[in-house]
């Protein structure tokens, strides 16, 4: 599901796959060939979230921001199952392991 918040809608036009029960909210930009898997929540309500080309966010992960703390994921990144990312930057070609916080 895609939701706008404060009249800002997610930019997911280039994404390769968004699971039907994933939730993408607000100021979120998904670059080319990004995949968002089942039960993922990406909440760009306070600051922007950008996910780089070829990256994937796996089942049950939660990505969100805080005021002054945007979230940026580089290119070709794998965010493993049930990962919690809050207002951080991940470089290109990284693997964030299962259950990481």
Please identify what each model-predicted range represents.
Residues 1-16:
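Extreme N-terminal tail/first-helix region
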Residues 14, 19-20, 25-26, 31-32, ...:
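Left-handed beta-helix
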């Amino acid at each position: 599901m895609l939701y706008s918040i404060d009249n800002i809608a997610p930019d997911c036009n280039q994404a390769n796959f968004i699971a039907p029960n994933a939730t993408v909210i607000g100021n979120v930009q998904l670059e080319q060939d990004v995949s968002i898997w089942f039960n993922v929540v990406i909440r760009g309500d306070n600051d922007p979230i950008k996910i780089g080309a070829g990256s994937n966010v796996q089942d049950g992960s939660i990505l969100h921001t805080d005021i002054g703390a945007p979230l940026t994921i580089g290119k070709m990144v794998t965010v493993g199952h049930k990962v919690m990312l809050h207002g951080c930057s991940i470089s290109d070609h990284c693997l964030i392991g299962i259950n990481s916080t």
